[in-house]
Amino acid sequence: MKAIDLIDGPVSVLNRDDVDTDQIIPKQFLKRVERTGFGEFLFFDWAKQPGWDLPSNPILVAGRNFGCGSSREHAPWALEDYGFHAIIAPSFADIFRSNCTKIGLLPVQLSPQACAAIAEAGVIALS
């Protein structure tokens, strides 16, 4: 696991609750055994929708219960491979949170109000 000293920069906002691991990385992309190459498939089904835009910033601000569903490790791998170093949300699925910390992807649980304020500000520094 990599050490985490400071993560700062612009945030990407995914204003959705109950985002499950199947939405983060669909099952058809789980055949790889290495941890790299998943970023291009992140939120694959949503990325095909008109108007979808999720910049590759260091920090993702998400909704409640982020990472629910199956316990696949591929979801944190895809988020990390896409460029995220931290995820800020009001709550996380327990197994997802554990999988994130194992690879050095920082899950930060804050109040819904704090998440909304960070999303509106568009930038944050975490240390």
Go through the PLM ranges and name each one.
Residues 1-56:
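N-terminal beta-alpha supersecondary unit
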Residues 58-84:
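Glycine/serine-rich anion-binding loops at beta->alpha junctions
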Residues 93-98, 114-117:
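Short gly/pro/ser/thr-enriched loop/turn and capping motifs at secondary-structure boundaries
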Residues 3-6, 52-54, 80-81, 116-118, ...:
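Solvent-exposed alpha-helices and their adjacent loops that cap or buttress functional pockets
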Residues 103-127:
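Acidic, glycine-rich flexible loop/linker segments
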Residues 83-96:
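A short glycine-rich beta-strand->turn/loop micro-motif centered on a GG-aromatic cluster
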Residues 10-12, 22, 57-60, 85-87, ...:
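Structural motif
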